[in-house]
């Protein structure tokens, strides 16, 4: 009895220790959503924060150069300053994406797959159509309803001319 308790205690201790070790394996830093975030949107053209949060040494030097006259900056430097602040220009934001092709392709795949399933069901699952679907059967059924004078006021029998044996015009 004592041996089983010892093994049980050792087993529980080993499991709990390994769980604790695994739990502290990596630390995930969560994003603080109370701070403003960068977003490229046409309806929100000036985001609260810059696109690049941590500047490199060359970008810091360029930011210092920006404080002087802008006429001394080259076109490439102006573009690089713009890219520090914004990820995309309005032309790039307005550019159409090719996502619609993926959506249409996926929809067509599922429509085609559904068509294959329906064809398989018609061939292997469903039996032949009942005889009541034949045109001859429907004609006989209609003739019988006319002979019985079904619904003579507003229905089928009211539209049949019994003297001429044809539909009223």
UniProtKB/Swiss-Prot annotation:
Q: In which pathway does it act?
A: Energy metabolism; oxidative phosphorylation
Source species, domain of life: Eukaryota
User: Where does the record say the transit peptide is?
Assistant: 1-22
For this UniProt entry, the molecular function terms from Gene Ontology, in alphabetical order, are: cytochrome-c oxidase activity
Membrane topology annotation: Single-pass membrane protein
Tell me which UniProt keywords the record has, alphabetically: Acetylation, Disease variant, Membrane, Mitochondrion, Mitochondrion inner membrane, Phosphoprotein, Primary mitochondrial disease, Transit peptide, Transmembrane, Transmembrane helix
Q: Does the keyword Aminoacyl-tRNA synthetase apply?
A: no
A biological process from GO: mitochondrial electron transport, cytochrome c to oxygen
Please give the SUPFAM superfamilies that the UniProt record associates with this protein. Mitochondrial cytochrome c oxidase subunit IV (SSF81406)
Please give the chief subcellular localization of this protein. Answer: mitochondrion
State the tissue distribution: Ubiquitous.
Residues where N6-succinyllysine occurs?
29, 60
The UniProt entry, under InterPro entries, shows: Cyt_c_oxidase_su4, Cyt_c_oxidase_su4_fam, Cyt_c_oxidase_su4_sf
Q: How does it assemble?
A: Component of the cytochrome c oxidase (complex IV, CIV), a multisubunit enzyme composed of 14 subunits. The complex is composed of a catalytic core of 3 subunits MT-CO1, MT-CO2 and MT-CO3, encoded in the mitochondrial DNA, and 11 supernumerary subunits COX4I1 (or COX4I2), COX5A, COX5B, COX6A1 (or COX6A2), COX6B1 (or COX6B2), COX6C, COX7A2 (or COX7A1), COX7B, COX7C, COX8A and NDUFA4, which are encoded in the nuclear genome.
Q: Indicate the disease this protein is implicated in.
A: Mitochondrial complex IV deficiency, nuclear type 16: An autosomal recessive mitochondrial disorder with onset in infancy and variable manifestations. MC4DN16 features include feeding difficulties, poor overall growth, short stature, microcephaly, developmental regression, severe hypotonia, and seizures. Cerebral and cerebellar atrophy, and abnormal lesions in the basal ganglia can be observed on brain imaging. Patient tissues show decreased levels and activity of mitochondrial respiratory complex IV.
Query: What family, per the record?
Result: Belongs to the cytochrome c oxidase IV family.
UniProt-recorded name of the protein:
Cytochrome c oxidase subunit 4 isoform 1, mitochondrial
State the organism's lineage: Eukaryota, Metazoa, Chordata, Craniata, Vertebrata
Gene (name only): COX4I1
């Amino acid at each position: 009895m004592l041996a089983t308790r010892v093994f049980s205690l050792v087993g529980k201790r080993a499991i709990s220790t390994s769980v604790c070790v695994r739990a502290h394996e990596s630390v995930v830093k969560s994003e603080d959503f109370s701070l403003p975030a960068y977003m490229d949107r046409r309806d929100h053209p000036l985001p609260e924060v810059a696109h690049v949060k941590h500047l490199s040494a060359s970008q810091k030097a360029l930011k210092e150069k920006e404080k002087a006259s802008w006429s001394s900056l080259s076109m490439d430097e102006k573009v690089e300053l713009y890219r520090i602040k914004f990820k995309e220009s309005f032309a790039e934001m307005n550019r159409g994406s090719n996502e619609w092709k993926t959506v249409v392709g996926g929809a067509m795949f599922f429509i085609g797959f559904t068509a294959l399933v329906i064809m398989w069901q018609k061939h292997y699952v469903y039996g032949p159509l009942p005889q009541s679907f034949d045109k001859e059967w429907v004609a006989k059924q209609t003739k019988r309803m006319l002979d019985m004078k079904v619904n003579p006021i507003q229905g089928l029998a009211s539209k049949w001319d019994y003297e001429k044996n044809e539909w009223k015009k």
